[in-house]
Swiss-Prot record:
Species annotation: Eremothecium gossypii (strain ATCC 10895 / CBS 109.51 / FGSC 9923 / NRRL Y-1056) (Yeast)
Location (main, coarse): nucleus
Name the UniProt record assigns to this protein: Suppressor of hydroxyurea sensitivity protein 2
Family per record: Belongs to the SHU2 family.
Keywords: DNA damage, DNA recombination, DNA repair, Nucleus
Cysteine disulfide partners in this protein: none
Record-level GO cellular component terms: nucleus
Phylogenetic placement of the source organism: Eukaryota, Fungi, Dikarya, Ascomycota, Saccharomycotina
GO biological process terms held by the UniProt record: DNA recombination; DNA repair
Subcellular location per the Swiss-Prot or TrEMBL entry: Nucleus
Biological function: Plays a role in a RAD51/RAD54-dependent homologous recombination repair (HRR) pathway to repair MMS-induced lesions during S-phase. Required for error-free repair of spontaneous and induced DNA lesions to protect the genome from mutation.
Superkingdom assignment: Eukaryota
Amino acid sequence: MAETNFNYSKLLRNLVTEDNVLNEVVVSFLYQLFPRDLFVRAFSLLESADMFIYVWMPTPKEADELLESLYNGTPLYRPIVRPRGPDDRPVCVDLDHWFCSCTEFAATCRPHLVGDTPLSDALFRPTEAADPDDCFGMLAGLQHLRADPEKLMCEHLFAFAILLQTDLRVLRHFSTGPGAQVFVLGITSIDEWLKLHLNVV
């Protein structure tokens, strides 16, 4: 199969079986598929209990409804990674615009900023469209993207994309039950939502 036709979402949604168990065969394959230990770092982040997804919901919802809305609805949400040290800052992720506030992601653009070529010319060119069913792989087919998608990826973007752009089953596996390691929190108060943006985002 040609790399341009590879459906990452279809593969990553098989990370968790129907019985809510990690599929070790898929985990091993993904380890080989992604470069420079990216999968290992993203998977470690998924198991770190440092990932939070804050969801704005003016009307309170049950926990399962809240998770389903992240796949079946269009809620306003903020994926955030808790700082690891006292001097660290929270990492904010925006999957819709493929942006992360971490230094690793910023470093991918830095060489283009110091060069003579404008950033838009350095990173963009016409490309073929991606498979419309492959939410996770859409980065590779963004109109005009020149840079290698793997270079515009960090562990935070990868981990949240695994949770939010593959299958609801994967999100449930990591965010529900006694062993939950990713926290999905609904916010119903506009004051609390604004405080989140002032204090974290």
